[in-house]
Amino acid sequence: MAREFSLKNTRNIGIMAHIDAGKTTTTERILYYTGRIHKIGETHEGASQMDWMEQEQERGITITSAATTAQWNGHRVNIIDTPGHVDFTVEVERSLRVLDGAVAVLDAQSGVEPQTETVWRQATTYGVPRVVFVNKMDKIGADFLYSVKTLHDRLQANAYAIQLPIGAEDDFKGIIDLVEMKTYMYNNDLGTDIEVTDGFPADMADQAEELRGQLIEGVADFNEELMMKYLEGEEISIDELKAAIRQATLSVEFYPVLVGSAFKNKGVQLMLNAVVDYLPSPVDVESIKGINLDTEEEITREPSDEAPFSALAFKVMTDPYVGKLTFFRVYSGTAEAGSYVKNSTKGKRERLGRILQMHANSREEIPMVFAGDIAAAVGFKDTTTGDTLCSEKDNIVLESMTFPEPVISVAIEPKSKADQDKMGQALAKLAEEDPTFRTETNPETGQTIISGMGELHLDILVDRMRREFKVEANVGAPQVAYRETIRGAAKIDSKFVRQSGGRGQYGHVVVEFEPNEEGAGFEFENKIVGGVVPREYVPAVQNGIEEALENGILAGYPVVDVKARLVFGSYHDVDSNEMAFKVAASMAVKQLKDQAKAVILEPMMRVEVVIPEEYMGDIMGDVTSRRGRVEGMEARGNAQVVKAMIPLSEMFGYATSLRSRTQGRGTYSMHFDHYEEVPKSIAEEIVKKANG
């Protein structure tokens, strides 16, 4: 089978937005205009739109699919869904890993909002080129130039308008294209009757000329040839300007801004043109790097069909029709349905059963995938999010996504016996889809504990369990994932001797413990000289230490960032065995409590609260009362932003408290930042509670 679209004509994009900027409608309209069946103008008076939308409402395909494939102007556009809420930054990060470019959607009334900033910063970290779509131009208070200004003021983004709206709010009736110098007038609300004229409308010509001048000046910074022409007053052709805007956008230091109203079907086709004109194809971005498992060397995989097959699984979903779907992005090479590939992350062989591509209102089974494609596989057994897939001959592991450890846990119990069995299956499926969601059974109480990235994260998962798996469950009070560590060094001599007639037990170790660097985890070194502890017992010593650290020394929380050195010991020819050394090692850990200054650590959250100015004093006081540190404040438009570091244990119920303090006008976002030592008085309470 030959390729349908060349790599150069492929675009893998995400739609990024704040919760209410209109991301869903924008995505729906993109799919409507690129739909293979309903090309605009083929059907009468919008009948096509209505039936499509009804089917859409019944099945909800576009919004639930992790990646949808569409066509536009001879290009293939794969749209990867990105969530809009901050508890799901992991979802956002994982989609940013597999897309090449993005459309940032803003609300024309509010411009850049707090969540926009978080997502924007993540996209900058991953070096993702963006175009900006200022949506909801028909809304009361919509102001295009103000929105462009917020990009400069709040994100310090080098953003330039490449379009200008004609009218605003109810009067929004057209768009001026500053690049091609054309005017688009919309004569109906379906976006089907469009009148295109060359030049600018007379009453807006001055403003349009001025903005076009600013655009050329802005883009000339990235292109010397254009700069010379501009300074010498020569005519710059439309093609030259487009090429220069593309070059500047790909540098991730220049952002073209477009305008429209997805709901009223205005500006979406022009935005699709911009996606094709200015966003990168897989060939324009840096080739993916990975580690060759055989040689341990870093290697690069070129985006080409001739290169060996390599792909990254970026989302696992459970589909009611076909079961487990694994969405993956192909970086190099090709693979056929029915063939075997290797999951190099897990070292397992997987069969690529069927390959599906999701379209706006259908799913298509395809015989093979090519470099740059995004598709879903049916039939994978062991593959989870972040795993690398490659050809069986060429071992490579692409840099995997790193997922933060969950910071909040709750106990969950089924409401009835019937729910009991279903709950286990539901939790297993949800954990498979979301790497930051963990589920475990507490061995002492038999309770099921679920852990995640925040209260909202867990609420939504419990809600999905009810909706998708029909499991009713009661949820307990949230618990914080504390950790323990040591602040001092200690040399501990630990002997385990048991003699009760017949063969005894004998294990003796001397272990030096000291704090490791933050985040470095547990390190074990064997410094035994002269075989005083036989080599075959050393793994048992390490094992004993690790298990004991996992069970805590103060309050039963895992101990992190510790170095252990086995320096001396002794053994008995008859009575020594692995078990005895394991017990001796774990007894050594118990003694750390008094000898190595053991402390409890708690997760600290980076919190941003956005509030109207009059609540400033109240909120600052509240942050302090929650043991928080205010780390900065800034004015953002007419609101104030308070940035603070607050312990997670003090953040429960904050959403409700903030709502009542600010009459519902405050918003906040928080994400895990680091672990910090708990103050003595609180540590004593935690220990008391843990040890009952």
Swiss-Prot record:
SMART domains (UniProt xref): EFG_C, EFG_IV
Binding site for GTP: 17-24, 81-85, 135-138
GO biological process: ribosome disassembly
Gene3D superfamilies: 3.30.230.10, 3.30.70.240, Elongation Factor G (Translational Gtpase), domain 3, P-loop containing nucleotide triphosphate hydrolases, Translation factors
Domain tr-type G, first and last residues per copy: 8-283
Entry keywords, A to Z: Cytoplasm, Elongation factor, GTP-binding, Nucleotide-binding, Protein biosynthesis
Molecular function GO labels: GTP binding; GTPase activity; translation elongation factor activity
Location(s), subcellular: Cytoplasm
Taxonomy, superkingdom: Bacteria
Statement: the UniProt record of this protein carries the keyword Transmembrane helix: no
Similarity remark: Belongs to the TRAFAC class translation factor GTPase superfamily. Classic translation factor GTPase family. EF-G/EF-2 subfamily.
Function statement: Catalyzes the GTP-dependent ribosomal translocation step during translation elongation. During this step, the ribosome changes from the pre-translocational (PRE) to the post-translocational (POST) state as the newly formed A-site-bound peptidyl-tRNA and P-site-bound deacylated tRNA move to the P and E sites, respectively. Catalyzes the coordinated movement of the two tRNA molecules, the mRNA and conformational changes in the ribosome.
HAMAP family the UniProt entry points to: EF_G_EF_2_B (MF_00054_B)
The name this protein goes by in its record: Elongation factor G
Record organism: Exiguobacterium sp. (strain ATCC BAA-1283 / AT1b)
Gene transcribed to yield this protein: fusA
